[in-house]
Amino acid sequence: MFFSRHLFLFFVLAFCFSQVHGVTRYSVDEQENISIYQKSSRAVVNISNIAVNYDFYYRAIPAESGSGTGFLINKSGIIVTNYHVVEGASKLVVTLSNNSQWPGKLVGADPNNDLAIVHIQAPAESYDVLKFSHSNDIVVGQKVLALGNPFGLRQTLTTGIISALGRTIAAKNGRKIEGIIQTDAAINPGNSGGPLLDSEGNVIGINTAI
């Protein structure tokens, strides 16, 4: 009886410990990252830029000339991305997080600020949307999260902080773009056009790999 009581007590303690351990498996910061990723990733898309080349007999040969990222901002299928992601495309193919593919139509562009708007006609239930932050209190040291498709590796999350504000960089057309947010979150080719999120999951910037 003595042995069985202690054995029972051991199992009770072990069970309780496992439950507590399960609750605290992730730090508060990790839980926040996981939550933001799960709420935001369905709004992030891959954009393939298809250019058409011609062979000796002038037969069209479609070929992917590049790819990048975009994100949906409403249930009408409006996507924000970088202009250089879609520049020169004969055809745009948008891949949602559920792997479904949809033709994209360029409906707006601001080359001077490297911004573009793409539209898709996909069922509204097949994606989520992101909201822009209304806060002007963006500060150096603030935590940020970047979502995108670096090197074609879809649905990638990286984290970091705001390293500096008000930077100036040159766009591909040579024009200077001001008011840039610098971050140490890893942003590589393919991330361009993806969202930079604050700790509430709101968009505070659009990623550009330089």
Task: State what each model feature region is.
Residues 8-18:
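Bacterial N-terminal signal peptides
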Residues 3, 16-18, 179:
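Intrinsic low-complexity/disordered segments
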Residues 21-210:
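Serine-dependent protease modules
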Residues 1-8:
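Bacterial N-terminal signal peptides that target proteins for export
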